[in-house]
Amino acid sequence: MVLSGCVAGQADDQATTTSPTTAEAPSNPWDLPIEQRPALFDPCAEIPVEAVEQGVGGPVEPVDEYTRHQPGGLMVCGWSTDEVDLSVLATWKSRDDYLNDDMFKVQDLSYEVMDRPGLRVGESDDYTKKTCIQIFFTARGTIWTKLDLFGAFHEFKGERFADPCESLDEAMVPIMASFPEGDFR
């Protein structure tokens, strides 16, 4: 049993029975106000280009149109090959926000990539089934990874009519070592 409070002594002296409070940071950064959370993951600075190239099977070019650097709000980096675009985004958008966002269609509430559970979604308007998105909720924000197959044959590593989610799973293997730890679903 834990007791806390005050007791009165003979001379009306008061003593607390609780230990002094300490300013301990919560173990879940998602419980903190946005301005007190850790720095967002920066995919451009923290994912080696070599890992991206290994994941997509060849040389990549950065996609400047995808790049955003808004510390505390949105960090985005994108790369392109002749077959695919791969983008990684970090934000503090919550799982519930994604589940309630009409722009996304949930495919799996706890899809795992390399034993890390996350949220697998597609874009609601992706009628050609050429994109796939995997979302993790980490200690340094939501990490959103998207693969777009383009071209008439939707190729990935030379395979025609590739499944975008299987392609994303394969592309993520080498880059996931760079992702922050934590699973805060």
Walk through the language-model features, giving the residues of each.
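C-terminal motif of bacterial Sec signal peptides marking the signal peptidase cleavage site
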Residues: V2-G5
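A small/polar (G/S/T-enriched), proline-flanked helix-loop surface module common
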Residues: G9-R185
